[in-house]
């Protein structure tokens, strides 16, 4: 263990007992001091410790200070010593080089001073001593360390500190009583270092502590001079805590710390720091009274090391130990402040110093960015210095959280280069609404506020603070510098609730919410509340509700609450009692009223009523609704009318009596107002006069009808009286024979409704109303009846009717004079039976109509779709009607249809039945005069070449039609004269080898050609100037453009048809190569201009160019015996290659197919 530097130097001699006399106490200083004891200028023959001189010394003219020393007889190292030895002792302070000597001279008590410090080195012994009070002010400590190293053997060393605490009084000396000193043993180590602890109570810190040291070693005892001190003057505080450094808003380095908490006085601090940067190195030592120090000229990339210690400011004290060193290094980019917490609408600024490659960037080259996405305009920049740039954000909006980031990042950049460090900007909306209300007893005020509208920050706390003014509120509330916090409890609904109790009704309570965060504090806008202005009164008491008798109004009464004493307004809500009350509101502004009456539609219902109140001037809140009050249903008026009634007549033929049973329905509450105690039947006859009969609550009465006329009236009676308006019924023998109902018809509409209609004949009697009566026949069912006004001629009965049952309907006319003769029917009318049987038509007919419309629409759409598939989607064989029923999954189908056809195919009907194959053969001439050589417009296509001489088919002028539904191997195209839009059917090309031709076939073709072109309207042979008709030609096809204004003369096949038909099924077999199928599309010209075609090899859709329309057709015959060797001159310069329309069978070679496939085809006429 290393001894502290504050200690007491002890002088040890074995077997020596030294007694130092003293008269005065040395005052202990707050700093370290040294106690030195020196022998007198007498030389002794004993061995002194090393470093102590034997030379004598003077006391600079003063008398010697004599210290007596008693020696034991057992001493072995001393010689020629008297029994007493005198020593000089000196107290030497760090603050003073002179020594104060304590001596016991003849003149009395005195201090000997001005002793040179060399005396301590020549002879005597030295002690370092320092004493102080701990910071907890409970323990006084002294450290002692010997500076003289004893060369002798060190015996058991014991050190005691003797002390006494004395209260200091002015003018009185310190006189401790004998035996008043207390002793504490000090803890000593092997290196002669001791520590002594003296307990001191807090109440005696200002007392004087007298003490001296008692040192025992090897049988010798040494008493040090007396010392004195006040503990409060030597307090040593603990080192400062929480050392921290940061860059301030102005760019300075702020060193801050916190002072010890137990010190009873203010401290001063000593700060030492060093700065190390690439451009500067410096050290400083400053003393401040605050707990912070600002260091200016801070540069990026610098390192600072700081230590702090403290001591009493306004009195003596001891410096504390130095705090632990704290190191702080600035970044290459310095933001000050690095983080800002502010509220919405405020203006804030950031400063920046940018260091790039050991060089500080000029502030004029710095640019600012927000979140690295938005460049801040230069109008918001300010140049603070050569290297400090400033940016200002005015009127800030609340920060929108982006994931876990609850702030905006502000970047300071060197033109186009940005460092990864950034400043953080937190903007919070602190508009928190605080609402308060005072209870009805005026004893407490409850305030509520919610934080749902603001953004919560991690580490932030919320606190309500308030300031109470003596009277009322200021015009503009503001945050007062002196405020008090208020504890608020979080409720289940998310609101915080604070209670002020007791309260001052007229004082102004200014409140705001403070948001505390490590970055700073924010205050919400303050609001000022006067408890008297936010009173919520108690609800009115003694609320009653009733329906007033004879008047029929809802009367409500209440009592005003005791508090507050202001004038109050009242609000009443009332409604029919039930699960969900439909409230109606009524307000009362007359403060003197305590009751009111309101009209209600139903006087016989139970009403619920509640009342609440509020200050008449509008301040404060509405009170809670009072406890509901309910009305009691009682009779408020006499019944409005008596019940409607009817009768049943029972005749007893044996007794010749008629019994009448009156039937009536109980009155409803709205008619009885509000109950019926009994029913009274009033009778009147000419013989017996008038009498009444009380039947109680029964709803029928039977009496004997004995006179010609008997009138009855049924009255309803409640607690107030009998009904005033009643129904009368007179039973008269003569009137029962009056018949004015001519007919009655009943029509069942459904199982719950039957319609009745009737016809009346003129009558002189005054008809009042009808009674309609119905029941099920053949059963003793209850009779049902209704009263119908006299003006009605048709009426609908709503009841449950069984269709299989028969009903009896009776219609009674009721006159003033009595009941007339009824019209009775025992079943529905005949029309009614029909209507009943056909009742299902009302449901079935709409369904059938809807289904028909849907089916018709489906058929129309299907027809259009089929037409599109069969006509416009060619060449897909699956969309063609001729392919229906064929299995294209079998290879034999394709082989049979498209590969080998050695036999001729019988001509069949068109694929679409609604369209005509050919009605006639017409030839239109396209020339204007006989001299013009214009080719014909429409000519038949002969599929074979029969003999022209054996048959003739002539073209005449007749307009008749020749139908070829069963014609074989021939297709005739026709254009209807009445249709302006040309139409093409289909054509087939078949060729056979020349060797296979029969002579008859050749003759038939020659005859056809010669006869058909020999008529008056036929084409002259000269029109084919460049064409030659050869017998060996197997097929030809003439087609040309037709002018839209020219008409086509009709060609009629009236002759030679039989000859042509003879060849049906007898065509020779073909032996040429495999032939391909060609397709020809048919559409209008306008549509063809924008249409496309599909090639056979490439399978690519290609548009039809406009210049290919109305082009000539050229039939290429290479291996097909050359039907046409030269092109037909058809009146246009263009040429067109023909491809057949339908997939009939043609025998052109594959090479011809390829040539034709590369052409544009059109066959519109």
From Swiss-Prot:
The modification Phosphotyrosine is found at residues 986, 1079, 1141. GO terms for cellular component: basolateral plasma membrane; external side of plasma membrane; receptor complex. A motif (WSXWS motif) lies at residues 622-626. Residues 897-905 are annotated as: Required for STAT3 phosphorylation. Present as a mixture of monomers and dimers. The phosphorylated receptor binds a number of SH2 domain-containing proteins such as JAK2, STAT3, PTPN11, and SOCS3. Interaction with SOCS3 inhibits JAK/STAT signaling and MAPK cascade. The chain crosses the membrane at residues 839-861. Its main location: membrane. It is found in: Cell membrane; Basolateral cell membrane. This is Leptin receptor. Residues 22-838 are extracellular. Disulfide bonds join 37-90, 89-99, 131-142, 186-196, 188-193, 352-412, 413-418, 436-447, 473-528, 488-498.
């Amino acid at each position: 263990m290393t001894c502290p530097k504050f200690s007491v130097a002890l002088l040890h001699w074995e077997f020596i007992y030294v007694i130092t006399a003293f008269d005065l106490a040395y005052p202990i200083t707050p700093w370290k001091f040294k106690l030195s004891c020196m022998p007198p200028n007498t030389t002794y023959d004993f061995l002194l410790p090393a470093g102590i001189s034997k030379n004598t010394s003077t006391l600079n003219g003063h008398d010697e200070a004599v210290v007596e020393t008693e020696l034991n007889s057992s001493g072995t190292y001393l010689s020629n010593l008297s029994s007493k030895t005198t020593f000089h002792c000196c107290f030497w302070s760090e603050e003073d080089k002179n020594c104060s000597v304590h001596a016991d001279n003849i003149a009395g008590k005195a201090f000997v001073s001005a002793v040179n410090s060399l005396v301590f080195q020549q002879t005597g012994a030295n002690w370092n001593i320092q004493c102080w009070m701990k910071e907890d002010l409970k323990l006084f400590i002294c450290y002692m360390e010997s500076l003289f190293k004893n060369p002798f053997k060190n015996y058991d060393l014991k050190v005691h500190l003797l002390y006494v605490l004395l209260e200091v009084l002015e003018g009185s000396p310190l006189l401790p009583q004998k035996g008043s000193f207390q002793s504490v043993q000090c803890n000593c180590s092997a290196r002669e270092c001791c520590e002594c602890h003296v307990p001191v109570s807090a109440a005696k810190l200002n007392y004087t502590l007298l003490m001296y040291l008692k040192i025992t070693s090897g049988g010798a005892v040494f008493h040090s001079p007396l010392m004195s001190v006040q503990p409060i003057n030597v307090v040593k505080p603990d080192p400062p805590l929480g050392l921290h450094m940061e860059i301030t808003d102005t760019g300075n380095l702020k060193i801050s710390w916190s002072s010890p908490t137990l010190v009873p006085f203010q401290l001063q601090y000593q700060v030492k720091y060093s700065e190390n940067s690439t451009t500067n190195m410096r050290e400083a030592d400053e003393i401040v009274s605050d707990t912070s120090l600002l260091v200016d000229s801070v540069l990026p990339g610098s390192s600072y090391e700081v230590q702090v210690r403290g001591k009493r400011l306004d009195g003596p004290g001891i410096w504390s130990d130095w705090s632990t060193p704290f190191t702080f290094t600035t970044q290459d980019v310095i933001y000050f402040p690095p983080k800002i917490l502010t509220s919405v609408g405020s203006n804030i600024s950031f400063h920046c110093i940018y260091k790039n490659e050991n060089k500080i960037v000029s502030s004029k080259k710095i640019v600012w960015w927000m979140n690295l996405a938005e460049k801040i305009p230069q109008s918001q920049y300010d140049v603070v210095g050569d290297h400090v740039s400033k940016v200002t954000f005015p009127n800030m909006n609340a920060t929108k959280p982006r994931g876990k980031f609850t702030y905006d990042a502000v970047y300071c950049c060197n033109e186009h280069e940005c460092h990864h460090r950034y400043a953080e900007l937190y903007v919070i909306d602190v508009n928190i609404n605080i609402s308060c209300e005072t209870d009805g007893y005026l004893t407490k005020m409850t305030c509520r506020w919610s934080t749902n509208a603001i953004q919560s920050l991690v580490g932030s706390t919320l606190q309500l603070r308030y300031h109470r003014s003596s009277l009322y509120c200021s015009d503009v509330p503001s945050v007062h510098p002196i405020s008090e916090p208020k504890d608020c409890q979080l409720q289940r609904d998310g609101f915080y609730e604070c209670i002020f109790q007791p309260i001052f009704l007229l004082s102004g309570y200014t409140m705001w919410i403070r948001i505390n965060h490590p970055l700073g504090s924010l205050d919400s806008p303050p609001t000022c509340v006067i408890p008297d202005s936010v009173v919520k009164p108690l609800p009115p008491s003694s609320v009653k509700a009733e329906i007033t008798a004879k008047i029929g109004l809802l009367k409500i009464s209440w009592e005003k609450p005791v508090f507050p004493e202001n004038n109050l307004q009242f609000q009443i809500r009332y409604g029919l009692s039930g699960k969900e009350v439909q409230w109606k509101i009524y307000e009362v502004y007359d403060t003197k009223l305590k009751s009111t009456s309101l009209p209600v539609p139903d006087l016989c219902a139970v009403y619920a009523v509640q009342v609440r109140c509020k200050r008449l001037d509008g301040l404060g809140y509405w009170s809670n609704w009072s406890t509901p009050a309910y009305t009691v249903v009682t009779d408020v008026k006499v019944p409005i009318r008596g019940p409607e009634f009817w009768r049943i007549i029972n005749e007893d033929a044996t007794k010749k009596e008629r019994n009448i049973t009156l039937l009536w329905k109980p009155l409803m509450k709205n008619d009885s107002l509000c109950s019926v105690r009994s029913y009274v039947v009033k009778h009147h006859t000419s013989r017996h006069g008038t009498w009444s009969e009380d039947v109680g609550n029964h709803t029928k009465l039977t009496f004997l009808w004995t006179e010609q006329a008997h009138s009855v009236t049924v009255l309803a009676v409640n607690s107030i009286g009998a009904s005033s308006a009643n129904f009368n019924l007179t039973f008269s023998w003569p009137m029962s024979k009056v018949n004015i109902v001519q007919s009655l018809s009943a029509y069942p509409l459904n199982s719950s409704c039957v319609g009745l209609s009737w016809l009346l004949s003129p009558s002189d009697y005054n008809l009042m109303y009808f009674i309609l009566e119905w029941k099920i026949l053949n059963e003793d069912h209850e009779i049902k009846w209704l009263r119908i006004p006299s003006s009605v001629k048709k009426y609908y009965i709503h009841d449950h009717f069984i269709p299989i049952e028969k009903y009896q309907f009776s219609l009674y006319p009721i006159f003033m004079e009595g009941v007339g003769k009824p019209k009775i029917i025992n079943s529905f009318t005949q029309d009614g039976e029909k209507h009943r049987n056909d009742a299902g038509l009302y449901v079935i007919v709409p369904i059938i109509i809807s289904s028909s419309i849907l089916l018709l629409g489906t058929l129309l759409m299907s027809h259009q779709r089929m037409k599109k598939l069969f006509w416009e989607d060619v060449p897909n064989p699956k969309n063609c009607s001729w392919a229906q029923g064929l299995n294209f999954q079998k290879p034999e189908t394709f082989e049979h249809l498209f590969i080998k056809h050695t036999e001729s195919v019988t001509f069949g009907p068109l694929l679409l039945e609604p369209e005509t194959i050919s009605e006639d053969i017409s030839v239109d001439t396209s020339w204007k005069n006989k001299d013009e050589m214009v080719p014909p417009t429409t000519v038949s296509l002969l599929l074979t070449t029969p003999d022209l001489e054996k048959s003739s088919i002539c073209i005449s002028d007749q307009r008749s039609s020749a139908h070829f539904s069963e014609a074989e191997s021939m297709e005739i195209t026709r254009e209807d004269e009445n249709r302006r839009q040309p139409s093409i059917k289909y054509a087939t090309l078949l060729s056979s080898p020349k060797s296979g031709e029969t002579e008859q076939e050749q003759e038939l073709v020659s005859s056809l050609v010669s006869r058909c072109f020999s008529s008056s309207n036929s084409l002259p042979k000269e029109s084919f100037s460049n064409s030659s008709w050869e017998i060996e030609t197997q097929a030809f096809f003439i087609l040309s453009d037709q002018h839209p204004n020219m008409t086509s003369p009709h060609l009629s096949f009236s002759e030679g048809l039989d000859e042509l038909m003879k060849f049906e099924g007898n065509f020779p077999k073909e032996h040429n190569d495999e032939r391909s199928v060609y397709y020809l599309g048919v559409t209008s010209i306008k549509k063809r201009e924008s249409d496309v075609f599909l090639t056979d090899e490439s399978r690519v859709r290609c548009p039809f160019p406009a210049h290919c329309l109305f082009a000539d057709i050229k039939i290429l015959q290479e291996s097909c015996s050359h039907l046409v060797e030269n092109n037909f001159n058809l009146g246009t310069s263009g040429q067109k290659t023909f491809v057949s329309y339908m997939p009939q069978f043609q025998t052109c070679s594959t090479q011809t197919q390829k040539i034709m496939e590369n052409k544009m085809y059109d066959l519109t006429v």
